[in-house]
Regions:
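Predominantly a Rossmann-like dinucleotide-binding segment in NAD(P)-dependent oxidoreductases
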Residues: 78-164, 292
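C-terminal helix-rich "cap/oligomerization" subdomain common to oxidoreductases
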Residues: 11, 19-24, 257-299
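Beta-loop-alpha module in the N-terminal Rossmann-like domain of NAD(P)-dependent dehydrogenases
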Residues: 3-64
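Rossmann-fold dehydrogenase core element
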Residues: 59-77, 98-103
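Hydrophobic residues in well-ordered beta-strands that form the structural core
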Residues: 7, 47, 72-74, 185, ...
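Active-site loop of classical SDR/Rossmann-like NAD(P)-dependent oxidoreductases
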Residues: 242-255
Length: 299
């Protein structure tokens, strides 16, 4: 097939005024500017996570979309996993009662097999940090289920990535949910050889639930008063990149939603405001403590 290719997004947009939707799947630090260019060229946009690396840039995308009457779809495909959809129903139905404590643990491997292949990964300006690149999916799930957080306290460390990244590889965060309850989020990419887990534990008024597996794809524990756990559909496997694995391979559902939403048949699963909120939460998490940032000097 004779498919045209470009090294400049604006050149592509200028050459193809017939485009309806543009997918922004470039390095994180380019997402906002390229989404803005697409919107201003008359396109709807699908933005891979994160929407941007700062709240200010995300707000610019949101305002441009409103001004031009365009839709923004943020790729947060873990929402489509059966355990995530089940948790959403359990929380929104009130079956769990008051949420008292939430603990999220994300322990993955990202070593030279990952950072050594693609130069922008691990850089401050184009990657942004582990919360943006590896774990924003799970911050999105947390926000989607329980709402916003405040009173954030954090600690960050770089255990074994000083040679290949500009920032932390691990962190511990505690906070309160605005809607009530306490939370904690611990993460690391310093796990040896392979991913260990991504888990979410809920201590609630009417019971306890834990979702685990490598990317919150398994129900590990369910003990809820007067409730019998149903059999959920199987989760899709993780995105497999050879030497390492990512989150759930649910991108097909994202694009089904894009088509359905633009056809007026569905609501957007993860809209611009939700994508912006994830960036805002990460920005506040990082602001809660000193990060082990490598000094970057301009040449």
């Amino acid at each position: 097939m004779d498919i045209p290719w470009y090294t400049d997004a604006q050149v592509m947009l200028d050459a193809h005024p017939e485009l309806d939707v543009v997918c922004v799947c470039t390095p994180n630090g380019l997402h906002a500017a390229q989404a803005l260019a697409a919107i201003e060229s008359g396109c709807h946009v699908v933005i891979e996570k994160p929407m941007s690396l700062t709240r200010r840039e995300g707000e610019e995308v949101l305002h441009a979309a409103l001004a031009h009457g365009k839709q923004v779809f943020c790729v947060m495909q873990n929402r489509y996993s059966p355990p995530s959809l089940w948790l959403k129903e359990m929380v929104e139905s009130g079956r769990l009662g008051q949420i008292r404590m939430v603990q999220i643990q994300c322990y993955w491997n990202r070593d030279d097999r990952y950072y050594g292949k693609i130069p922008w990964k691990g850089t401050r300006d184009l990657d942004g940090g582990t919360l943006f690149t590896q774990f924003s999916h799970f911050i999105d799930i947390m926000y989607w289920l329980f709402g916003d957080i405040h009173h954030i306290q954090g600690r960050f460390a770089d255990f074994n990535h000083a040679h290949n990244t500009d920032f932390e590889d691990s962190g511990l965060l505690t906070f309160d949910f605005v809607n009530g309850g306490m939370g904690s989020f611990s993460f690391s990419t310093a796990v040896d050889r392979q991913n260990y887990e991504s888990s979410l534990t809920i201590i609630a008024e009417h019971g306890t639930v834990k979702v685990g597996g490598q990317y919150m794809n398994e129900i590990v524990h369910c003990d809820i008063s007067g409730y019998e756990m149903p059999e959920l559909p199987p989760s899709n496997p993780a995105n497999d990149y050879g030497d390492y694995k990512g989150s759930a391979a649910n991108h097909g559902y994202v694009f089904e939603n894009v088509v359905a939403a633009l056809s007026g048949m569905e609501r957007i699963t993860t809209n611009a405001l939700e994508g912006l909120k994830v960036v805002d939460i990460i920005e506040r998490m990082y602001a809660s403590a000193s990060r082990p940032m490598k000094s970057v000097t301009s040449s």
